[in-house]
């Protein structure tokens, strides 16, 4: 197994209920606060607003609870245990159905509602502790179904097949992604980042030399080129760990804020270059950035790409851009957060290109994703000015800012299902 990919799927510890259908769209203000978290994570729900085989968080309130046994008075009680996977179906009909999935065993479990012939998944309950019950409510279409159970220290079990009559289309499932499906894309992505880090190291070297020479006008242009290169790497920041904090960290939460010695990297240099600091004040931060980038490049070949991150970051990159760049939060003087967002779009596109062969047959909303990327990018680049300058967010007119925010919010809705669709499953 190459050192650059990590196939192991972490065992979920917290409850999660997912549904492979899409009855409504989430509002922009919810998406702006939405945060995917690395598994395991309490109550993480996939969300989408597109029709077709995608994930949404239409969950009964009890399904969000992280502890206790939930009421099973309503709906079919589906048993999950080593001796009875998926037992308990009765009075099954097409249309909206509620299943109470109960773990009657002594070990943690998860259960999928699947098409037993194709393996397509319609719903999932994860982190199901012993003695607990979680509800699933979904639009059950006509066809054949079975529950598939994954219990700790037990082989995969598939329950009895149940036929639902009639001609109701219901929710459509999607084929689950496997670890093997994602190993190739992870290698391609690893190579993409390697090339990007080589470019970044050269650009940061130029920036450092310009600062040491006192050529601060040239350093400002070099800073922007290098920073955008880093932002185009997109998904990697989750893998970079502490290096990302050193290279692209904010002063938020530091005791001395902007003057704190722990405030390093691109934003520290940006602040100095655009707030009248002299070359001698910036020489130290520039040397530190150069050292950190070279260290990251040196260690990257041995770093792992978490397979879960490949799809996760397609949404999270631009979610972070909406929160920090399009609000102007991360403008430390250069006024280039719109350029940063455009670079984030490039990083998102790269991930989508790598994942495209896997997504095209699983996600019918993919054309809307590409259209959304094009729309947002076109709005951003109209704010580029001669000489490498950009309109700061604070200087945008109300109409243009609303257009950009709306385009970003819509795009996030289109991107939201991809993380769950590409999550490697057993």
Language-model features: where?
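Short coil/turn motif common to extracellular beta-sandwich-like domains
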Residues: 92-99
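Short beta-strand/loop motifs in extracellular/secreted proteins, especially
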Residues: 97, 107-111
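Asparagine-centered strand-capping/turn motif at beta-strand->loop junctions
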Residues: 101-105
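Short strand-edge motifs at loop-to-beta-strand transitions and within beta-strands
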Residues: 132-138
């Amino acid at each position: 197994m190459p050192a650059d990919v990590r196939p192991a799927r972490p065992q979920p510890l917290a409850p999660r209920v997912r549904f492979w259908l899409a009855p409504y769209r989430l509002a922009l203000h919810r998406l702006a606060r939405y945060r995917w978290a690395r598994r395991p994570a309490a109550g993480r729900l996939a969300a989408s607003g597109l029709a077709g085989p995608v994930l949404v968080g239409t969950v009964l309130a009890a399904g969000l609870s992280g502890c206790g046994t939930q009421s099973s008075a309503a709906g079919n009680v589906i048993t999950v245990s080593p001796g009875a996977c998926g037992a308990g179906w009765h009075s099954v009909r097409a249309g909206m159905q509620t299943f109470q999935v109960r773990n009657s065993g002594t070990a943690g479990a998860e259960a999928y509602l699947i098409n037993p012939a194709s393996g397509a998944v319609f719903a999932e309950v994860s982190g199901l502790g012993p003695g607990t019950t979680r509800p699933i409510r979904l639009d059950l279409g006509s066809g054949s179904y079975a529950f598939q159970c994954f219990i700790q220290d037990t082989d995969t079990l598939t329950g009895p097949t149940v036929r639902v009559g009639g001609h109701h289309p219901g929710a459509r499932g999607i084929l689950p992604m496997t670890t093997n499906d994602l190993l190739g894309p992870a290698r391609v992505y690893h190579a993409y980042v390697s090339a990007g880090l080589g470019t970044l190291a050269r650009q940061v070297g130029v920036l450092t030399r310009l600062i040491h020479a006192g050529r601060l006008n040239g350093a400002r242009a070099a800073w922007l080129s290098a920073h955008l290169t880093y932002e185009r790497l997109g998904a990697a920041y989750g893998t970079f760990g502490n290096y990302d904090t050193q290279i692209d960290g904010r002063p938020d939460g530091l005791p001395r804020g902007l003057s704190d010695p722990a405030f390093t990297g691109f934003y520290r240099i940006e602040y100095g270059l655009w707030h009248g600091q002299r070359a001698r004040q910036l020489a130290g931060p520039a040397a530190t950035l150069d050292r950190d980038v070279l260290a990251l490049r040196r260690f990257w070949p041995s770093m792992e790409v978490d397979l879960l991150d490949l799809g996760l970051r397609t949404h999270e990159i631009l979610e972070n851009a909406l929160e920090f760049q399009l609000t102007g939060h991360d403008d430390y003087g250069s006024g280039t957060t719109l350029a940063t967002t455009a670079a984030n779009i490039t990083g998102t596109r790269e991930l989508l290109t790598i994942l495209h062969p896997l997504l095209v047959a699983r996600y019918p909303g993919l054309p809307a994703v590409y259209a959304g990327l094009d729309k947002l990018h076109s709005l951003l680049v109209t704010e580029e000015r001669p000489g490498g300058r950009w309109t700061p967010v604070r200087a945008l007119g109300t109409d243009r800012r609303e257009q950009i925010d709306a385009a970003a919010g819509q795009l996030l809705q289109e991107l939201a299902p991809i993380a769950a669709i590409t999550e490697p499953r057993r």
